[in-house]
Design a protein with these regions (language model features):
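Bilobed periplasmic-binding protein/Venus flytrap-like ligand-binding cleft at the lobe interface
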Residues: 19-22, 76-112
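Short arginine-rich
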Residues: 183-190
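Solvent-exposed, acidic/flexible segments
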Residues: 66, 70, 86-90, 152-156, ...
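Surface-exposed helix-capping loop/turn segments at secondary-structure junctions
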Residues: 9-17, 105, 170-173, 190
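Long, aromatic- and glycine/proline-rich binding clefts that accommodate carbohydrate-like moieties
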Residues: 108-161, 165
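Extracytoplasmic/periplasmic substrate-binding proteins
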Residues: 3-85
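Short, charged, surface-exposed loops that flank catalytic or proteolytic processing sites
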Residues: 165-180
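Stable alpha-helical elements in mature extracytoplasmic
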Residues: 3, 86-90, 102, 155, ...
């Protein structure tokens, strides 16, 4: 938190109210910004002709001596409802769309961001995304997977507001850590 606070003093105030997509849009539609140390990876912004400018993604900074770790891996997956009337067909579809061949072809070609590791290593995909997947692979491998319990997404949304408040005021890092810890523990009870 203290590192974030020192970095926050060097950025434009708009950054404190922007989400990751707004940040990517700003960086790809203007020539005013060169570097963003932490941003969600959206591979489409690395594709030629997606926006005015291309975002070149790389692994996050190694501040721990353990590699580019500490980020979280999220995203959208696919599941089959237990009450589906076509469970077998739905399961077959889920395996197909998550499989390497679909992820490397139709899924990617339709603008999707592959989650399959074989697609991450695909030469054509990396060529077309300016090495997005190769250049961030260590970060992906060392990321922790976002928790999946029911209250987590609300915690994530609200914790960002708490951290943002810390960055803009004189509240102590210790009190923010206590507040975040309480919020996280309560996220399991919802």
């Amino acid at each position: 938190l203290t590192m974030m606070k020192s970095v926050s003093k060097e950025i434009i105030n708009d950054c404190l109210s922007m989400d990751p997509i707004q940040t990517a849009e700003l960086m790809t539609e203007t020539n005013d910004f060169y570097y963003c140390p932490y941003i969600y990876g959206f591979s489409n912004y690395s594709r030629n002709n997606y926006r005015k400018n291309i975002l070149k993604y790389i692994d996050v900074l190694d501040l721990s001596g353990k590699g580019p770790s500490g980020t979280h891996l999220g995203g959208t997956g696919i599941a089959v409802s237990n009450v589906s009337k076509n469970k077998d067909l739905a399961i077959e579809y889920a395996f197909w769309i998550a499989g390497a061949e679909c992820q490397k072809s139709l899924f990617y070609q339709s603008g999707g961001q592959p989650g399959n590791s074989e697609a991450w290593e695909d030469e054509k995909i990396n060529l077309e995304t300016n090495d997005f997947f190769k250049a961030t692979r260590k970060t992906l491998d060392l990321a922790w997977v976002r928790p999946r319990h029911n209250g987590y997404m609300e915690f994530q949304d609200k914790s960002g507001d708490v951290i943002n408040e810390y960055l803009q005021t004189e509240i102590s890092a210790e009190s923010i850590c206590e507040k975040l810890s309480d919020m996280y523990n309560k996220s399991f009870k919802e």
